Amino acid sequence: MTDSNQTIPSISDIHDGALAARLQSALDNKTKPLGALGRLESLALRIGLVLGSETPVLEAPQMLVCAADHGLAARGVSAFPSDVTWQMVENFLAGGAAVSVLALQHGLALTVVDCGVRRDFQARPGLVSRRIAAGTADASAGPAMTAEQCAQAIANGREVVRALPGNALLLGEMGIGNSSAAALLLARLAGLDIDGCTGSGTGLDAAGLARKREVLRDVLALHAAASEPLDALAAFGGFEIATLVGAVLQAAQERRVIVIDGFIASAAVLVAQALQPHVAQRCVAAHSSAEPGHALLLKHLGLEPLLNLDLRLGEGSGGALAWPLLESACRILREMASFEAAGVSRKDS
């Protein structure tokens, strides 16, 4: 049995006024009008602060995709059957999924974690087995996870990240029904109306969305006492989200740059931030998805997304698409010339 108190590491405040000033000065002195690179400059500043460097280098970036099934999916909250979870895990590993293609394109090492899929997988490179159970319990009938299962999943996420190289972690997930868990976590931890947090997920029609919202209202009411972050996580699930919570906490403790994908990955950061309030300092929001709850969640975290492409896929696909922007931000700091070095006159010269 894993004690939840032992699974939550201390996360320090990385604010460094002196380093921030040096980074800003370096950016201001590049051969360009002041602020002309817009949000690429604020991104460079954030990465520099996370890595504690005036010349940050992103090394061995890791794409971590956590997968699990949800008991709540039996209530018809998704347009797809639960079998799609294991089928997509196979697709990830075969190189046929969007995140597989994009990770390969951008040089991101892909690791897929079975956190609780209702299927046995053959061992192979790129697959890590950390299965808690064959899917969570139905949250409409009781807690999705026990407290012990929740703590073990968080511990698993920390363990997986400890074994990965590099200083950047990109978050991905797969689990039919997990947009429901994300909506429930957002409503409870941010104090928002569940209907506004709930979208069509994998493509529900209007009737399906109305049914999903009704189910989630009932689930939220059933677990009215689950107000603390770990209690809410155990009540709503899922195993992949809890494993990502652990991954985020470990990456934050190690001062890795954490690249958040869509709604579900962001829900894991929401829980981690509720547990340790300096987590979001290490995070970059890759994009704002078409799920209505995602923009609300990012606003709650105080994060501004880099892209808005109407994505609603998950997997880590948005993080992979945003990755070149992070690399460009670092190169601006490291390689772009200053006015003095280039012999270029300033505006006020």
UniProtKB/Swiss-Prot annotation:
<keyword id="KW-0808">Transferase</keyword>
<comment type="function">
    <text>Catalyzes the synthesis of alpha-ribazole-5'-phosphate from nicotinate mononucleotide (NAMN) and 5,6-dimethylbenzimidazole (DMB).</text>
</comment>
<keyword id="KW-0328">Glycosyltransferase</keyword>
<keyword id="KW-0169">Cobalamin biosynthesis</keyword>
<protein>
    <recommendedName>
        <fullName>Nicotinate-nucleotide--dimethylbenzimidazole phosphoribosyltransferase</fullName>
        <ecNumber>2.4.2.21</ecNumber>
    </recommendedName>
</protein>
<dbReference type="InterPro" id="IPR003200">
    <property type="entry name" value="Nict_dMeBzImd_PRibTrfase"/>
</dbReference>
<comment type="pathway">
    <text>Nucleoside biosynthesis; alpha-ribazole biosynthesis; alpha-ribazole from 5,6-dimethylbenzimidazole: step 1/2.</text>
</comment>
<dbReference type="InterPro" id="IPR023195">
    <property type="entry name" value="Nict_dMeBzImd_PRibTrfase_N"/>
</dbReference>
<dbReference type="GO" id="GO:0008939">
    <property type="term" value="F:nicotinate-nucleotide-dimethylbenzimidazole phosphoribosyltransferase activity"/>
</dbReference>
<dbReference type="InterPro" id="IPR017846">
    <property type="entry name" value="Nict_dMeBzImd_PRibTrfase_bact"/>
</dbReference>
<dbReference type="InterPro" id="IPR036087">
    <property type="entry name" value="Nict_dMeBzImd_PRibTrfase_sf"/>
</dbReference>
<dbReference type="Pfam" id="PF02277">
    <property type="entry name" value="DBI_PRT"/>
</dbReference>
<comment type="similarity">
    <text>Belongs to the CobT family.</text>
</comment>
<dbReference type="GO" id="GO:0009236">
    <property type="term" value="P:cobalamin biosynthetic process"/>
</dbReference>
<feature type="active site" description="Proton acceptor">
    <location>
        <position position="315"/>
    </location>
</feature>
